[in-house]
């Protein structure tokens, strides 16, 4: 065990001023944090006599930014002092927190700017605040002993006062998110006559053409070829050469071949598009895993943060294998990211839909345990989900969604998909129990709609997490599915399980309402339907 060092003392007058501001603004924000509608409405009316709720939220977020800067400074100081004695995993955990705190400041500044804008979009701001709450959860996960039971390289315990700062940031964000819900107005769901469209509106006409066109007809900006016939031989070099903070599409063509590298697209690499030669032809492969000392957040073969990322005709593979525990093939925290005809190949934790709004069309996802997980608002449409053969004695869970508050507009929606056994599981599927999902956090939300569910799924359908955790607060729903595994006669009887019986309830999880697909998918060029 590494000794815990005290956090460096700050000048007393700075602490006094900061605490004064904190107590004042926390008082304002907690006034509207009650879950009682009548109480909230009454207090909101009183507060808006002097300040509008957006102004209160801005004040709360500016306070939160101060706290994030304090947390970042303390994490950095602590990392510097402890670095020689930290394990590789512990260094990863510190790096994750510092990076996520930087992302937190970036997203909060965007939210403040948006709240001051005349074209205020409450849905976008709700998503930003939810993203930031997810960053705090991810930071603390890295230091959680319960999440690191696969090996013994987590010997350092984060000081309680630093944990409290992160939790306090989350509480502030929770208050802000709830205040936002008080004044936001949901857009009406599209009518059935309006949803049968080919593309969502957040994809531009140019991006639509890019996705429809064969690669030889695509005007790409850079090319990568392992045989030396492109601009670069590695994907990382091409990403480094791409512009920062681009507002227009930047296309990187990755010629067929196997590329053995871990690729990270930071937040500044926006509007990047990867185009390959097809599943199994353009393959990006690596093998980082939790067992080998990497944090789950750093295991991805490809990780993306910059907004507007698109991938087409590529295989993303983590080849660590079933014995290596968490080993992510792809991680997306890219808002308005979209994937078309891609493959995600791994075992445990294959596809990390970490945060923001995402869309997957005609993709193949392979895995064993929790192989689609995270807290994005994500829709899988016309895709195939394959359970692979796990280690002996393990149970298969297709999803592990991590929504942490009822106000968060996140969840996993599986629409018009196929839920199947992979070829290696088919001969032995009677030896393993497979489930549609299990809860990662208290308000976990996953729905299966108009999909084919094969006979590998256990009649109960869904798997408990730890004992009775989240069984009353989760939202797991099924609607108009087909196949031998779709029979709900013996499904779980948890309070949070829904046998969805009307189209209105199911419609809220389609592309239009759930990820605001009408506002951004058109620009990606990926075919989609806003409704069923």
Curated annotation (Swiss-Prot):
Keyword Secreted (UniProt): yes
Listed binding positions for substrate are 296, 326, 438, 440
Extra information = The PMEI region may act as an autoinhibitory domain and prevent untimely PME activity during transport.
The protein's recorded glycosylation sites are 62, 74, 85, 172, 221, 231, 244, 287, 382, 404, 502, 522
> Which InterPro entries does the entry link to?
Invertase/methylesterase_inhib, Pectin_lyas_fold, Pectin_lyase_fold/virulence, Pectinesterase_Asp_AS, Pectinesterase_cat, Pectinesterase_inhib_dom
Q: Which UniProt keywords apply?
A: Aspartyl esterase, Cell wall, Cell wall biogenesis/degradation, Glycoprotein, Hydrolase, Secreted, Signal
Q: Where is the signal peptide?
A: 1-34
Q: Where in the cell is it found?
A: Secreted, Cell wall
Where do the catalytic residues lie?
349, 370
Which organism is the protein's source? Arabidopsis thaliana
Tell me the protein family, please: In the N-terminal section; belongs to the PMEI family. In the C-terminal section; belongs to the pectinesterase family.
Q: Which SMART domains match?
A: PMEI
Quote the cellular component terms of the Gene Ontology held in the record.
Answer: extracellular region
**Lineage start:** Eukaryota, Viridiplantae, Streptophyta, Embryophyta, Tracheophyta
Instruction: Tell me which tissues or organs this protein is expressed in.
Output: Expressed in siliques but not in flower buds.
Q: Which GO terms describe its biological process?
A: cell wall modification; defense response to Gram-negative bacterium; pectin catabolic process
Q: Where is this region: Pectinesterase 39?
A: 221-518
Report the protein's function.
Answer: Acts in the modification of cell walls via demethylesterification of cell wall pectin.
Return the protein name: Probable pectinesterase/pectinesterase inhibitor 39
Q: Which gene encodes it?
A: PME39
Query: According to the UniProt record, where is the region Pectinesterase inhibitor 39?
Result: 35-169
State the pathway, as annotated in the record: Glycan metabolism; pectin degradation; 2-dehydro-3-deoxy-D-gluconate from pectin: step 1/5
**EC id:** 3.1.1.11
Q: Which reaction does it catalyse?
A: [(1->4)-alpha-D-galacturonosyl methyl ester](n) + n H2O = [(1->4)-alpha-D-galacturonosyl](n) + n methanol + n H(+)
* One Pfam family linked to the record: PMEI
């Amino acid at each position: 065990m590494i000794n815990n060092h005290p956090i460096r003392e700050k000048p007393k007058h700075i602490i006094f001023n900061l605490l004064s501001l904190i107590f004042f603004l926390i008082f304002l924000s907690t006034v509207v944090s009650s879950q009682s509608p009548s109480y909230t409405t009454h207090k909101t009316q009183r507060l808006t006599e002097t300040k509008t709720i957006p102004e209160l939220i801005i004040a709360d977020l500016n306070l939160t930014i101060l706290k994030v800067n304090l947390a970042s400074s303390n994490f950095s100081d602590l990392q510097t002092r402890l670095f020689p004695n930290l394990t590789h995993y512990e260094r990863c955990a510190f790096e994750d927190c510092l990076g996520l705190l930087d992302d937190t400041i970036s997203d909060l500044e965007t939210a403040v700017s948006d709240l001051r804008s005349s074209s205020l979009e409450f849905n976008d701001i709700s998503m930003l605040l939810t993203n930031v709450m997810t960053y705090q959860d991810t930071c603390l996960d890295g230091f959680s002993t319960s999440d690191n039971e696969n090996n013994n390289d987590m010997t350092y315990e984060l000081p309680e006062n630093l944990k409290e700062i992160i939790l306090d940031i989350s509480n502030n964000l929770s208050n802000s998110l709830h205040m936002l819900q008080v004044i936001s107005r949901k857009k009406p769901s599209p009518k059935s006559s309006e949803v049968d469209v080919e593309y969502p509106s957040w994809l531009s006409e140019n991006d639509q053409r890019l996705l429809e066109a064969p690669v030889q007809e695509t005007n790409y900006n850079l090319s990568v070829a392992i045989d030396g016939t492109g601009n670069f031989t590695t994907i990382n070099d091409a990403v480094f050469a791409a512009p920062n903070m681009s507002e227009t599409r930047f296309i990187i063509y990755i010629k067929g071949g196997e590329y053995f590298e871990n690729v990270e697209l930071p937040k500044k690499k926006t509007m990047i598009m990867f185009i390959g030669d097809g599943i199994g032809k353009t393959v990006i492969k690596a093998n980082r895993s939790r067992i080998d000392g990497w944090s789950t957040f750093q295991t991805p073969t490809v990780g993306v943060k910059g907004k507007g990322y698109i991938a087409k005709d590529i295989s993303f593979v983590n080849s660590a294998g079933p014995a290596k525990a968490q080993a992510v093939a792809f991680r997306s925290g890219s808002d308005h990211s979209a994937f078309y005809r891609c493959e995600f190949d791994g075992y445990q934790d294959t596809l990390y839909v970490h945060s923001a709004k995402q869309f997957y069309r005609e993709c193949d996802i392979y895995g064993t345990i929790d192989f689609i997980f995270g807290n994005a608002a994500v829709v899988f449409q016309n895709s195939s989900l394959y359970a692979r053969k796990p280690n002996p004695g393990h149970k298969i869970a297709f999803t592990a969604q991590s929504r942490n508050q009822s106000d968060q507009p996140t969840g996993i929606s599986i629409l018009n998909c196929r839920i199947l056994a992979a070829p290696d599981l088919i001969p032995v599927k009677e030896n393993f129990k497979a489930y549609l999902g299990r809860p990662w956090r208290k308000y976990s939300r996953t729905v299966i709609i108009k999909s084919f569910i094969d006979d590998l799924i256990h009649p109960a359908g869904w798997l408990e997490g730890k004992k009775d955790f989240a069984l009353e607060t989760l939202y797991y729903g099924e609607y108009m599915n087909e196949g031998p595994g779709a029979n709900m006669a013996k499904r779980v009887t948890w309070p949070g399980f829904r046998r969805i019986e009307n189209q209105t309830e199911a419609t809220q999880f389609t592309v239009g309402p759930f990820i605001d697909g009408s506002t951004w998918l058109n620009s990606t060029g990926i075919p989609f339907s806003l409704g069923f």
